[in-house]
Amino acid sequence: MALRANDASFTTNDQVISALNEQSQAHSEVISQIFSEISKSIVGQKDVVEKIMVALISDGHVLLESVPGLAKTLLAKTISEVLGVSTVRIQFTPDLLPADILGTKIYKKSSEQFDIEKGPIFNNFILADEINRAPPKVQSALLEAMQEKQVTIHGETFVLSAPFLVMATQNPIESEGTYKLPDAQVDRFAMKILISYPSIDDEKSIIARFASSNESLVNPVITSDKVIELQKFSQSIYVDESIINYVTRIVDATRNPQNYNLDLKNAIEFGASPRASLWLIKTAKALALIHGRGFVIPEDIKSVAHEVLRHRIILSFEADVNKISADQIIDTILENIQIS
């Protein structure tokens, strides 16, 4: 039986669920304050902000795809200020070197010895702007740091600060002078979030806000310690066996659509990896926590499915020719795969 918000027939100890709900609601109130503070600076984009928070709480990284000028830098800066963590923007260019990100050894004449000069990777929030403009060596250096949460500089290993979130951006339009991220490396991002243009009303609000002389300042709501606490607590959010079965069937449908009577085989070159199943569960837990629940419901899975799966489904040539997108495939799967 699936756990739902209005379902009293839990398949685990009711007291455990009740305690998780109580703690989740307390954490959710704090998270609501975070969203409220962010909205002082960021107009609209509520779903984008929520999904970035989902990635952060689930201890994952984000690939942001949007055209230039949609306030990605302001978004990263605002979120980091509200969370009381450090942030840095790294502009990826063809001449960037791994040492420019990680750091290097520098000879100090005064001490007559080499000292480690740490790079910008030693911040909590990293905005890797236009990651696909840097050569593969630089991309690999960043992606290894994302995976291991540590870097090695001239044989010396340094653990990165926690929390650690990389928000990498890429432009969906321009391809000249770019290096395509390998599919295996893209898979390391927990979520791929698409940022769209603001609505007319939101754009009016943006114009009015920038026309005003009053600067929208935000204040820290929590500290990095609280972020880590949220990350740890989200791991304890309850997931029913039926939810796990639901997730595995969704992911399997990207690999073997014919087993679910889905006519998608010719559109998919390769389906999602097992990492997709793990991130569907982890991000759904984070979303449940944000909404003040101590357990995951099917709607949580559906809500994060596009962001978790869209960059993990490798489309076939036929799909490209027929302009079939990964999101369309995910829509079809979600419409046909039901929880049991």
Model-derived features: positions:
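C-terminal engagement/docking regions of AAA+ P-loop ATPases
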Residues: 2-20, 24, 258-340
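Conserved C-terminal "switch" segment of AAA+ ATPases
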Residues: 20-28, 41-42, 192-264, 290-294, ...
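Pre-Walker A (pre-P-loop) alpha-helix and adjacent loop at the N terminus of AAA/AAA+ ATPase modules
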Residues: 23-70
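Conserved alpha-helical scaffold flanking the Walker A/P-loop in AAA+ ATPase domains
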Residues: 50-54, 107-127, 156
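Walker A/P-loop
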Residues: 56-93
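Walker B catalytic acidic pair
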Residues: 66, 129-130, 141
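Conserved AAA+ P-loop NTPase core
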Residues: 89-121, 140, 177-186
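Canonical AAA+ ATPase core
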Residues: 108-113, 130, 134, 138, ...
